[in-house]
Amino acid sequence: MALRTLASKNALSFALGGAARPSAASARGVTTVALPDLSYDFGALEPAISGEIMRLHHQKHHATYVGNYNKALEQLDAAVAKGDASAVVQLQGAIKFNGGGHVNHSIFWKNLKPISEGGGEPPHGKLGWAIDEDFGSFEALVKRMNAEGAALQGSGWVWLALDKEPKKLSVETTANQDPLVTKGASLVPLLGIDVWEHAYYLQYKNVRPDYLNNIWKVMNWKYAGEVYENVLA
């Protein structure tokens, strides 16, 4: 049981570089995750993001990643118990994809905030100063992230990252549901924008740039600033 439990607990860490936090455990000792609650109503981000999109995005898409990740963990636990190395290796793809989907979306929900609660207010303090230093201005950062997000082929994410080693900000993109840690172990996600079609198509159709322009109206820069300061503390 010790080997099975260790493998299950370390599965997401193996695939994602330790970017996830377990939130529940099954009777067999397999560490699983749960769909996080939102701190705002589905319609609270309108008109930037419709309530219909938010409901489907959270209740269907994110929930599916959670369910599939937990299922893959249970299968991994069984494979380790049997000593089935081929199955263990085969399951890593499902763990990375679905675990990454859970990690990325858990960050994404925190990156959003209703306008009535301060969403869209530009960053201040240390993060604001760092943005000016590393990108020239807040407007230049937005332009850069919009361009990177619009140019990303297929599905993926665009990130504002803090590289802990040089203590510099950077803009990164990841494909599919790859989490930011796959681009480098020292990269910390401060803000992520989902550019999968499920994040915008019902409202913006195939005009991804319009979605990117409007999402800044509900960005939670307070949260990003807190993460930035905590990492550098």
Swiss-Prot record:
GO terms for biological process: response to abscisic acid; response to osmotic stress. SUPFAM superfamilies: Fe,Mn superoxide dismutase (SOD), C-terminal domain (SSF54719), Fe,Mn superoxide dismutase (SOD), N-terminal domain (SSF46609). The gene is SODA.3. GO terms for molecular function: manganese ion binding; superoxide dismutase activity. Pfam families: Sod_Fe_C, Sod_Fe_N. InterPro entries: Fe/Mn_Superoxide_Dismutase, Mn/Fe_SOD, Mn/Fe_SOD_BS, Mn/Fe_SOD_C, Mn/Fe_SOD_N, Mn/Fe_SOD_N_sf, SOD_C_sf. The lineage of its organism: Eukaryota, Viridiplantae, Streptophyta, Embryophyta, Tracheophyta. Keywords: Manganese, Metal-binding, Mitochondrion, Oxidoreductase, Transit peptide. The keyword Oxidoreductase applies. It is an enzyme of class 1 (oxidoreductase). Binds 1 Mn(2+) ion per subunit. It comes from Zea mays. Its EC number is 1.15.1.1. Residues 1-29 form a transit peptide. Its cofactor is Mn(2+). This is Superoxide dismutase [Mn] 3.4, mitochondrial.
